[in-house]
């Protein structure tokens, strides 16, 4: 008991952050996972649940309102923890239809983390663009470049995140994260997209750029998505969807007046 109290006390010392530091419960969970240096695909549910609940208790002690979404994730963690405490037959563990209780939560976390990575890249690009000054080009009123009707950048981002999140955990593990500066650049991926589109008679799905049966790095997919947005912006490629969050169809439109990055 003394050891448990000591551990809880040590945990509480680390829970000095505030609610407004996080965008939501998934943001908090990612923080705890990184703080404990855990693999996002192999979360130690008991430890994370304990710290997460301690955090909510701390908020209550400070008399701060806790959003309902935080309580929903707390209930989810407790449910996963209880399932993982149940004995599992060895034969069941090796069956193909065995479902890890953590799978849905892991996919939510991976999708949320992907949003963060894309948002961070947009922030860097925006900051870099603010430091540049260029002469405005004459407006050609006869030429307009738009994504297809009903398709917005926000919908493209949601479809992109859905593409990454729909993979099962085992397959997601194949998407490796490597911190290698400038391994992929937007300029190179722009050239790759245009070349590949020409090879496919000018039309193809964004997902066809990658071999998800092999190893695909998140950095590669994110950079390719940013390259697509840049090509759409300058009018060299159009993007469309038959339905919200559906596959992203790319169509090569040829050279535009404005050069891409």
Swiss-Prot record:
Gene3D superfamilies: 6.10.250.2410. InterPro entries: ScpA (IPR003768). The keyword Cell division applies. GO terms for cellular component: cytoplasm. GO terms for biological process: cell division; chromosome segregation; DNA replication. Keywords: Cell cycle, Cell division, Chromosome partition, Cytoplasm. Its main location: cytoplasm. It is found in: Cytoplasm. Belongs to the ScpA family. PANTHER family: SEGREGATION AND CONDENSATION PROTEIN A (PTHR33969:SF2). Participates in chromosomal partition during cell division. May act via the formation of a condensin-like complex containing Smc and ScpB that pull DNA away from mid-cell into both cell halves. Component of a cohesin-like complex composed of ScpA, ScpB and the Smc homodimer, in which ScpA and ScpB bind to the head domain of Smc. The presence of the three proteins is required for the association of the complex with DNA. This is Segregation and condensation protein A. It comes from Ligilactobacillus salivarius (strain UCC118) (Lactobacillus salivarius). The lineage of its organism: Bacteria, Bacillati, Bacillota, Bacilli, Lactobacillales.
């Amino acid at each position: 008991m003394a050891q448990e109290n000591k551990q809880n006390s040590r945990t509480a010392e680390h829970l000095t952050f505030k609610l407004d530091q996080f965008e939501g419960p998934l943001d908090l969970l990612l923080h705890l996972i990184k703080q404990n240096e855990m693999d996002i695909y192999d979360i130690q549910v008991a430890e994370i649940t304990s710290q997460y609940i301690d955090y909510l208790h701390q908020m209550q002690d400070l008399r701060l309102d806790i959003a309902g979404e935080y309580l929903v994730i707390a209930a989810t963690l407790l449910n996963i923890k209880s399932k993982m405490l149940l004995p599992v037959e060895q034969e069941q563990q090796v069956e193909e239809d065995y479902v890890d209780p953590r799978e849905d939560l892991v996919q939510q976390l991976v999708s949320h983390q992907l949003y963060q990575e894309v948002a961070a890249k947009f922030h860097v690009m925006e900051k870099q663009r603010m430091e540049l000054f260029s002469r405005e080009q004459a407006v050609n009123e006869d030429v307009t470049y738009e994504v297809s009707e009903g398709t917005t950048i926000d919908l493209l981002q949601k479809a992109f995140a859905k593409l990454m999140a729909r993979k099962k955990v085992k397959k997601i593990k194949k998407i490796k994260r490597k911190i290698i500066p400038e391994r992929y650049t937007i300029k190179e991926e722009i050239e790759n997209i245009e070349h590949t589109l020409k090879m496919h008679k000018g039309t193809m799905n964004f997902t066809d750029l990658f071999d998800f049966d092999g190893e695909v790095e998140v950095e590669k997919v994110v950079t390719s998505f940013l390259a697509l947005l840049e090509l759409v912006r300058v009018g060299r490629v159009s993007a469309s969807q038959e339905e919200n969050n559906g596959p992203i169809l790319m169509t090569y439109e040829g050279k535009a007046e404005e050069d891409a990055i």
